[in-house]
Amino acid sequence: PIQCIVTCRGINSPLSIQPDTIEISYLMQTGMLVWHAETAQDFYDWILMGYMVSEEPEVHLPLALCCDGFFVTHTKDVVDLTPTDMCLPPYDPYRSPVPCMDMECPPVRMMRDPFIMKSNYISYATHASWQQEVWAAAERSRKHTIAWLNGLIETEDVDADVLIVTSGTAVSQGREAIRLLADEGIRVGLVKIKTLRPWPEEEIKEATKHATHIIVPEFNVI
């Protein structure tokens, strides 16, 4: 499975390097796994973790690792590198849920009409059911994602009456807002969403069950 690195920047005129997460919305219903990094460290670490999850035989889906424009793409930061002797395990295509195609001797379909019609029907039925399998695979990725990312969400002070719930670098700005509000005596909690697919619905419900006000900041100028 491929991994797409998505740097979310303004797609409307004029050209901009500022963050705009509308690009992520185009990926939400494609069947891809979608993760949203807050920092350069997240971005670096999750590339390797993404391969570990997406290459699981029961998952085997492409993954979109998203980060926000400017704050991650156009700034400098210090990250902890993985040890030089740490490598991804070799990918074994024969563990894939989809049979490998031998490009040296590819299969060719040469049949008369009745057989072709039957074959095309089988292809249609396969693709019609495959959509359900893709979404099921995304759900099966949940346990692997939780293990590698240490949960689908990250929380701070969720017993506060006011919570900021967001993803990406809006989390960093949320942390700054929480610091400023604390100086004024206002206590605010934080829920950082790490993955959009799979969507951590139950985790968010549990984290926000005591909140009376929920604020959801995002970078979307359209």
Residue spans for each PLM region:
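Conformationally flexible catalytic loops at phosphate/diphosphate-handling active centers
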Residues: 62-154
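Histidine-centered beta-alpha loop that forms part of the nucleotide-sugar donor binding/catalytic region
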Residues: 6-8, 68
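Thiamine diphosphate
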Residues: 8-14, 19-20, 27-29, 140-222
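Hydrophobic alpha-helical scaffolding
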Residues: 13, 17, 33-40, 120-135, ...
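Conserved thiamine diphosphate
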Residues: 17-69
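Hydrophobic or amphipathic alpha-helical targeting/insertion segments
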Residues: 1-5
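A short secondary-structure junction signal
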Residues: 45-48, 75-78, 175-177
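Catalytic-core regions of core metabolic enzymes
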Residues: 51, 70-81, 202-205, 211
